[in-house]
From Swiss-Prot:
GO terms for molecular function: chromatin DNA binding; transcription coactivator activity; WW domain binding. Disulfide bonds: none annotated. This is Postacrosomal sheath WW domain-binding protein. GO terms for biological process: egg activation; female pronucleus assembly; male pronucleus assembly; positive regulation of DNA-templated transcription. It comes from Bos taurus. InterPro entries: GRAM, WBP2-like.
Amino acid sequence: MAVNQSHTESRRGALIPSGESVLKQCEDVDLCFLQKPVESYLFNGTKKGTLFLTSYRVVFVTSHLVNDPMLSFMMPFGLMSDCTIEQPIFAPNYIKGTIQAAPGGGWEGQAVFKLSFRKGGAIEFAQLMVKAASAAARGIPLGSVNYWFDTSGLYIITVPGAAVCSSQTPCPAYPIVIYGPPPPGYTVQPGEYGTPPEGYGAQPGGYGAPPMGYGAPPVGYGVPPGGYGVPPGGYGVPPGGYGAPPGGYGVPPGGYGAPPGGYGAPPAGYGAPPAGNEALPPAYEAPSAGNTAASHRSMTAQQETSLPTTSSS
């Protein structure tokens, strides 16, 4: 734990070691010490300010409007113990615990701290602090992406949803400034887009400029085969599976030509012949010349025998 080593020169922000992430920020928090170290005036009274939770520690920054000798107070998870959350009826919820002094931290011994959340959020802060401490102990610290960096290498973290801050346009409230190189994997400021990834290059061959009213050709449709001209208006690209007509549906085979002579239009009163009776079956072909004469003599004899006989009066 260190005293007066974690605040900016203007006392409007917190100094966070490089590589750590700010997980939560709470304003209007009161800090007091129920048990103070011996011979240290820095721990007297109640301090008002902003509380920050990072991947490895808790940092309290006293408000720049308050005249107090303790400007900042930093507590690493490894030096905190006996932390509890209290919910009094007529007072804000608070977190209480014991903190040990760190070598070179500006004080010696131990103290019992009390963090009161006047605007609420004590339970959420305590729960996240327990998760962060457990993750840090396993060597897998919690991370956050709520930071920004500019060309100077200065990191400025703001409340989620706030405007982006920079060295030219500082935040009006409590930015958190992080000194050091950018974390691994962050080399370009968000909002700048470089070369598109592989696979998003030029349009493949075979696709020219689409005609008016036609969008980009869908994937899987190449150049149409020969014999297919420009599609008529209102018709797009034919769906898949409709290629050339299958074999067998071309010119009709021999034997189905024009009907034989003598079969012209039917007499009046007869409609069109039913479907399937267009061609004569093999047994109903035209008779030969000899059969025609014999048939004519037979018909004449039948007519003569069937005529009635005339009787004399």
